[in-house]
Amino acid sequence: MTVVGDVAPIPRRNSSTCSNDIAAPLLPECHGDEVAHDEFNGASFSGAVFNLATTIIGAGIMALPATMKILGLGLGITMIVVMAFLTDASIEFLLRFSKAGKNRSYGGLMGGSFGNPGRILLQVAVLVNNIGVLIVYMIIIGDVLAGKTEDGIHHFGVLEGWFGHHWWNGRAAILLITTLGVFAPLACFKRIDSLKFTSALSVALAVVFLIITAGISIMKLISGGVAMPRLLPDVTDLTSFWNLFTVVPVLVTAFICHYNVHSIQNELEDPSQIRPVVRSALMLCSSVYIMTSIFGFLLFGDDTLDDVLANFDTDLGIPFGSILNDAVRVSYALHLMLVFPIVFYPLRINIDGLLFPSARSLSTSNVRFGCLTAGLISVIFLGANFIPSIWDAFQFTGATAAVCLGFIFPASIILKDRHDKATNRDTTLAIFMIVLAVLSNAIAIYSDAYALFKKNAPRE
């Protein structure tokens, strides 16, 4: 997503004229110039779908089977489908009003509707959300590959289990190697389309996890080792009723990808294809989410943990169970490594917009580009390694920033209706989105605060 200023639509590639008011960083000032320099003819449809799908499928996929445990398969799958439709509607709001206002960025659209404060608010939300997400990704990668010690109990990482404890497979060493060997090179691309192959591999790794989970579930189902799952929630008292709402934040934030939509559209060979791209990505991710939820819950039932990855740290009770456990954990760690650059891309753009709002395109300054990239990666690395309470902090700020990006900001643009384009249906849907987002955020903050106080309360 680009956020600095509004820009005129890019002319057709064969045109000899260029717009002079393009100020969005990392966007070519003229497609003709861009082609002349490096033969970039626009992003493909499939590449755009994979980039958007990778933006969506991050760490949240592992929390979905636990939502089935609370909601039951029938209601849980219905909620996933509903959230996919709401996400599609909110992105459609952004694209329709961007076209009306001739904006080619989310920030430009917010600036057009709410002035400079709106643009800055959007940039801060992306900053908080994406830094938090990337630090959490790095923490998870460290936990999976190097292990962790919690409450005096050491949980072995995959590499530690394979090779024993050595300096090179310790947490700090693994994260340093990953940062220098994977994150830094992938973060150096100036176009989001350059990440299409790593994004495709990232989606493929998520599918590998799904295939392994499905295979184990089917094997155990045939052998009679799996009970039929509940289709509806088990509500027996008021506490179990209120417990249903604790999964709302997980579902509401499951499809957040809005901060990358404009960047992907701007690089498309045919920008009008962005709506089919969005719908294809949402259909792909919905299918992966639904199948993961079904087979994850089918496999572990009421023993499904909040993070189903933790269930693969136990004995599966099947031949080659330990090998399959390691395959799931390694594929997931590799998946997160490849998600990292697609989430990092809009983070760098927004930091540049906050620090240098009137500067030329970030792609024209290698020094600024390099310094921002190195600085942000360093902050994320240090946060994941040396700030033990940072996960708790981002549980609060992350929930707030994510629902703002996905629902509150798009709905607010509709309610502002600067171009008189909103219908009664749009207004009703926008109000519903805001109510849902506020409810989700309140539940998430209450649940996280309650869990934190309970965790830190002195034991009797």
From Swiss-Prot:
Transmembrane segments annotated in the record for this chain: 45-65, 66-86, 120-140, 172-192, 199-219, 238-258, 281-301, 336-356, 371-391, 394-414, 427-447
GO annotations of cellular component type: organelle membrane; plant-type vacuole
Gene Ontology annotations of biological process type: amino acid transport
UniProt keyword list: Amino-acid transport, Membrane, Transmembrane, Transmembrane helix, Transport
Main location: membrane
Compartment(s) where it occurs, according to its Swiss-Prot or TrEMBL record: Membrane
Annotated membrane topology: Multi-pass membrane protein
Superkingdom of origin: Eukaryota
Family: Belongs to the amino acid/polyamine transporter 2 family. Amino acid/auxin permease (AAAP) (TC 2.A.18.6) subfamily.
Protein name from the UniProt record: Amino acid transporter AVT6A
